[in-house]
């Protein structure tokens, strides 16, 4: 009997030739924050291997959203290069997706050109740097930046967009009580903490229209005491469904809490094996799961 993995699947307006998706893992192949031939060749080779869709990773919706110096930044002048990339992917029979996001406080002035911004002000050990909390009157424009990036993705020929709302980046910083210490209508209760995500999704769905698939990557658990837990993340998932998202990419963890980044220590293999089993999949119905860790069975 043929595996269901290799049968077509439809979410929203998009049908894939099979159920395999190259997840939006950061490539670091965009010198000058623009697509390169290396990025094109990489995704073309993935598509040629028979995958259903390959996802270009972690494109910043604004310059302030950049975490890395070889990260894609969505702006009109890079559209011709992105069009070459999507044409190459489509020529191999695969769909082309792109992940859109903003790093929030996960940056440094030397990368993003300004003092990093986030849900709340403070000091981020990851960078390390001081962070300015976004004012409430700045949030509508930030949400519109997501919508503009979706329009640019459409112009570049992408079939789907994936909104990054996990891993401790900007949307996740608003959602998590660990990083959202606001006293206004965007902080406090979960309903308030979801308010910025709601604004983003409204702009995204408006720009996506009826012919572009929208995925959202979200945490099912932040992975540390004081972070989001399953009871709240299930409510976030339902809200995203109500917003019109066609699929959820279920994940977990906070980059800024990872000891290999903050303290440059050894990876916490024992605790990471908890995520190896993808325990959250039982909570999904129509889901796209994030690639799990493959670990050796013996110490090496």
Say what each PLM segment does:
Residues 1-293:
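Flavin-dependent oxidoreductase catalytic cores
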Residues 292-300:
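Single conserved hydrophobic/aromatic residue that forms the stacking wall/gate
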């Amino acid at each position: 009997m043929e595996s269901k993995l290799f049968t077509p699947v439809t979410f929203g307006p998009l049908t894939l030739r099979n159920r395999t998706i190259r997840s939006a893992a950061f490539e670091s192949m965009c010198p000058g924050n623009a697509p390169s031939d290396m990025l094109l060749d990489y995704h073309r080779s993935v598509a040629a291997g028979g995958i259903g869709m390959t996802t270009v990773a972690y494109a910043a919706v604004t310059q302030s959203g950049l975490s890395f110096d070889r990260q894609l930044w969505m702006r009109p002048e890079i559209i011709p290069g992105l069009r070459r990339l999507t044409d190459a992917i489509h020529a191999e029979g695969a769909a082309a997706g792109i992940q859109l996001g903003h790093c929030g406080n996960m940056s440094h002035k030397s990368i993003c050109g300004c003092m990093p911004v986030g849900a709340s002000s403070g000091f981020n050990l990851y960078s390390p740097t001081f962070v300015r909390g976004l004012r409430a009157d700045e949030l509508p424009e930030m949400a519109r930046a997501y919508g503009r990036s979706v329009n640019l993705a459409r112009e570049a020929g992408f079939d789907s967009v994936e909104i990054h709302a996990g891993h401790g980046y900007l949307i996740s910083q608003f959602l998590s009580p660990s990083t959202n210490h606001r006293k206004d209508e965007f902080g406090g209760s979960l309903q308030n903490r979801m308010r910025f995500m709601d604004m983003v999704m409204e702009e995204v769905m408006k720009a996506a229209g009826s012919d572009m698939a929208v995925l959202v990557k979200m945490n099912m658990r932040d992975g540390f005491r004081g972070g989001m837990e399953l009871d709240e993340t299930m409510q976030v998932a339902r809200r995203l469904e109500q917003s019109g998202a066609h699929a959820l990419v279920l994940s977990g963890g906070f980059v800024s809490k990872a000891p290999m980044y903050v303290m440059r220590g050894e990876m916490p293999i024992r605790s990471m094996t908890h995520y190896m089993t993808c325990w959250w999949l039982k909570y999904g119905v129509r889901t796209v799961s994030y690639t799990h860790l493959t670990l050796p069975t013996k110490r090496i």
